[in-house]
């Protein structure tokens, strides 16, 4: 699915936005602050699949949801989309969310939706984007960028990353919720080395995958302990002969596999979907 063109039409016609999946290619936990927040060093990229949002600026403030992953999505004030509207002080504007990404899956679906809602409401109100998006969640600032970024601190330190080729990939979620707080509690070592100060450039996905294999997702071991099905997901992805790297994203349970070509990723996705029709499987390109 390709992102729709964003922009406000003349008058008060609806404004469309795209909320891509966020993927942590690496996630190094480097410490923990006195207030409990964990310090991270993560290479973040975004998929070409995601949720779609449409804002009707003149309608009453509200949220409706449809789509293949709509079940269980709250439409009350606890939803980050409505929290984003409140954060900007919006008093009007109905958003319809077409939900394609699994929730609580380690791919930033809620944060990406919130970031897109901020953009749409800010555009409708003629306002600049706020610089305190982190008040809605640690992943919201990087989702506002929506491009390859090195994210550090508690998510507030963002550095653009150049020299990263498009990465054909398969995303797989087994349909198991892995609560993020439980994963962090299961982390045995909370002071781990960061990525190198200077990230290398890569000519091909294979070059990138080789380097990524020397890095980590420190949340993967505790997530696998909390949800052993992640072991099976990673084994299935890595078992494809064309897979360059298999790793978990974020705090799980979504995992990804990297491939050299989109055709290889598509073929792997078809095989995985056939073997596990109950899993969410999606080929994509990460950028």
Swiss-Prot record:
<dbReference type="GO" id="GO:0016114">
    <property type="term" value="P:terpenoid biosynthetic process"/>
</dbReference>
<dbReference type="InterPro" id="IPR036554">
    <property type="entry name" value="GHMP_kinase_C_sf"/>
</dbReference>
<dbReference type="GO" id="GO:0005524">
    <property type="term" value="F:ATP binding"/>
</dbReference>
<keyword id="KW-0547">Nucleotide-binding</keyword>
<dbReference type="InterPro" id="IPR013750">
    <property type="entry name" value="GHMP_kinase_C_dom"/>
</dbReference>
<keyword id="KW-0067">ATP-binding</keyword>
<feature type="binding site">
    <location>
        <begin position="102"/>
        <end position="112"/>
    </location>
    <ligand>
        <name>ATP</name>
    </ligand>
</feature>
<dbReference type="Pfam" id="PF08544">
    <property type="entry name" value="GHMP_kinases_C"/>
</dbReference>
<feature type="active site">
    <location>
        <position position="139"/>
    </location>
</feature>
<comment type="function">
    <text>Catalyzes the phosphorylation of the position 2 hydroxy group of 4-diphosphocytidyl-2C-methyl-D-erythritol.</text>
</comment>
<dbReference type="Pfam" id="PF00288">
    <property type="entry name" value="GHMP_kinases_N"/>
</dbReference>
<dbReference type="InterPro" id="IPR020568">
    <property type="entry name" value="Ribosomal_Su5_D2-typ_SF"/>
</dbReference>
<keyword id="KW-0808">Transferase</keyword>
<dbReference type="GO" id="GO:0019288">
    <property type="term" value="P:isopentenyl diphosphate biosynthetic process, methylerythritol 4-phosphate pathway"/>
</dbReference>
<comment type="pathway">
    <text>Isoprenoid biosynthesis; isopentenyl diphosphate biosynthesis via DXP pathway; isopentenyl diphosphate from 1-deoxy-D-xylulose 5-phosphate: step 3/6.</text>
</comment>
<keyword id="KW-0418">Kinase</keyword>
<dbReference type="InterPro" id="IPR006204">
    <property type="entry name" value="GHMP_kinase_N_dom"/>
</dbReference>
<keyword id="KW-0414">Isoprene biosynthesis</keyword>
<feature type="active site">
    <location>
        <position position="22"/>
    </location>
</feature>
<protein>
    <recommendedName>
        <fullName>4-diphosphocytidyl-2-C-methyl-D-erythritol kinase</fullName>
        <ecNumber>2.7.1.148</ecNumber>
    </recommendedName>
</protein>
<dbReference type="InterPro" id="IPR014721">
    <property type="entry name" value="Ribsml_uS5_D2-typ_fold_subgr"/>
</dbReference>
<dbReference type="InterPro" id="IPR004424">
    <property type="entry name" value="IspE"/>
</dbReference>
<dbReference type="GO" id="GO:0050515">
    <property type="term" value="F:4-(cytidine 5'-diphospho)-2-C-methyl-D-erythritol kinase activity"/>
</dbReference>
<comment type="similarity">
    <text>Belongs to the GHMP kinase family. IspE subfamily.</text>
</comment>
